């Protein structure tokens, strides 16, 4: 019956099992099943030279080993070169580019000082007292009797009270006692009074701290240096009591006889004035306060600044200034004039012609150099209120430490807000503090030279000077006569009373130096590509292939670790067989290939494999296992 029924149905459509998805439909991303398969595929298809030899020579193990070693050595050499290239790039080298430009140039600022510290009427009596005590000291120490002494020396000492820190003769200790003398430097200087004729003594003065618990001697081997420094120390104390309102222009005297720029007269509106404690009255021509900056369109001595200066010192301070003439400095319009650091002296009776050449330098900051653009990132406050320069920062740093350590400001540098200049009437130990601080500053223990970085943009002027006698012997009479009539001033000592100064551009060509990165990112990539092509003869796509290989290796390693983890922790009750089953299931689930590649025709291709959930046997729980009856036969389910 059933057979007839089947015959009636005839050859109908056969029952077909659900078709398994093909390999191309299984997943969007597929990976190789082993390291060997991945490496073989890479060597067969990569564009890197030499990799195919690792597969083609697999039947000759010697060749395989040779090419493997050669490939690894080449790979190592290439990455060694890569390390050198990256090391050079991250050392941030720079190239110095030199350009020669020619154009109209802005004439720099020129500062000229009298070299004659001024005697202000407000402190005349105090300066006379200092001069008198100094003359008495010279008589006591060097038997020098100056003609300015109007009375006997002993009476002079009785009239004027002694100044603090008197100048003394100091005995030079033997070398073996120098360390002991340094430890006991607070001993009285009255014991150090050897005869003048002996050579084992020096000149100096004693300086102590506030409570006189520590003292030292400021000593000099030259008597001239000792007298000048001692006089200078007391002079700036007196000068600190002078108010700024006393520095009026009406008291400056006649210093500049004539002034011309580009053959045109320059007047009061072309210069500004300031006072220097040591160099006297100073005039700055063509500074930032000038109405319009001077321009030089032609080189030569007739197209620059020409000054005729008075160098007589009728009311000079001989114990403070031992030279005569004038001091000049060339600098930028927005830079202060540091006469001690960059100036030089002019001789009386001489025409000094100074030719200039401009030179600029632009440094690279950041990783390429330790420079600052405007000083805003420097931990030192600019006291000069001008453009940042390294000298501005260094002097501001010293003044900052002076105020912090000594409680007062040094008169040579700008006065900070809320601080007064040092005066031993108010700060009796400031000299001790200053000389200690000066020693620490010179040895960079204050850190000023480290804090103050170089500016990224600098403009310098290269100077060269020429000298000639002026005026000549045949022309000096009428020249001095004209100067006397024109300026209503009589030149008493003709040749030592005047000096002439010419400052001009030697040529309008100026050198512009600039730094540029020696190795840029483009250069680095080019060098890396050159090395890659040299050792492997490949391109950027080959680098992508290497990255893909590393990615596949990491994924396969992750899958292997995942299988091991699942076999150990996810199937605890299935025994060794279950562990082997679970461990082998991901392999069967993986695709057989990553992309088509030739295989042997004799090897049968594996068919679609059912997932482990369909082929695995049911779990063997202990309660469902076979039980034996007393007769030894198996019992049916539910049977006791």
Curated annotation (Swiss-Prot):
Ubiquitinated. Can be ubiquitinated at multiple sites and undergo monoubiquitination and polyubiquitination. Ubiquitination by NEDD4 or NEDD4L inhibits the ENaC channel through endocytosis, intracellular retention and degradation of its individual subunits. N-glycosylated. Residues 1-23, 595-617 are annotated as: Disordered. GO terms for cellular component: acrosomal vesicle; apical plasma membrane; ciliary membrane; cytoplasm; motile cilium; plasma membrane; sodium channel complex; sperm principal piece. It is found in: Apical cell membrane; Cell projection, Cilium; Cytoplasmic granule; Cytoplasm. Signal peptide: none annotated. Disulfide bonds join 113-282, 208-215, 259-266, 371-456, 393-433, 393-452, 397-448, 406-433, 406-456, 408-422. GO terms for molecular function: ligand-gated sodium channel activity. NCBIfam families: ENaC. This is Epithelial sodium channel subunit alpha. It comes from Oryctolagus cuniculus (Rabbit). The lineage of its organism: Eukaryota, Metazoa, Chordata, Craniata, Vertebrata.
